């Protein structure tokens, strides 16, 4: 693939995730948008690793590390969201007033 096409696609994914993260009022949707941002970053890592230095796999290995961290972040985030839903019966961000108590 051409480098510019992949970078434009990655930028679109990043901007869609950023827009969703800023405008989202639902915690699950915010977590999904955060994962979209991380996938755009992973796409950049793999693209630049392949384009600039094909003999070394530093970008690919770092991408796998980011995927592992993102999986742990998603599991912890969903556990927190399910706990908040059990206690508050809502997953809306503006209705969670956990810091006010």
Swiss-Prot record:
Keyword Cell inner membrane appears in the UniProt entry: no
Keywords, in A-Z order: Chloroplast, Membrane, NAD, NADP, Plastid, Plastoquinone, Quinone, Thylakoid, Translocase, Transmembrane, Transmembrane helix, Transport
Reactions catalysed: a plastoquinone + NADH + (n+1) H(+)(in) = a plastoquinol + NAD(+) + n H(+)(out); a plastoquinone + NADPH + (n+1) H(+)(in) = a plastoquinol + NADP(+) + n H(+)(out)
GO biological-process terms attached to the record: ATP synthesis coupled electron transport; photosynthesis, light reaction
Keyword Transferase belongs to the record: no
Enzyme class, first EC level, given as a word: translocase
UniProt membrane topology term: Multi-pass membrane protein
GO function terms (MF aspect): oxidoreductase activity, acting on NAD(P)H, quinone or similar compound as acceptor; quinone binding
Residue intervals passing through the bilayer: 2-22, 32-52, 61-81
Location(s) in or outside the cell: Plastid, Chloroplast thylakoid membrane
InterPro entries hit by this protein: NADH_UbQ_OxRdtase_chain4L/K, NUOK/Mnh_C1-like
Disulfide bridge map: none
Principal subcellular localization: plastid
Subunit structure: NDH is composed of at least 16 different subunits, 5 of which are encoded in the nucleus.
Family the entry assigns: Belongs to the complex I subunit 4L family.
Protein name according to UniProt: NAD(P)H-quinone oxidoreductase subunit 4L, chloroplastic
Gene: ndhE
């Amino acid at each position: 693939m051409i480098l510019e096409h992949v970078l434009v696609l990655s930028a679109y994914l990043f901007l869609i995730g950023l827009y969703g993260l800023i405008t989202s009022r639902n915690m699950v949707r915010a977590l999904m948008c955060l994962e979209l941002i991380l996938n755009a970053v992973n796409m950049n890592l793999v693209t630049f690793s392949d384009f600039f230095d094909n003999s070394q796999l530093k970008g690919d290995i770092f991408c796998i590390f980011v995927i592992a961290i993102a999986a742990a972040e998603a599991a912890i985030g969903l556990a927190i969201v399910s706990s908040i839903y059990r206690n508050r019966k809502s997953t809306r961000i503006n209705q969670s007033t956990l810091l006010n108590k």
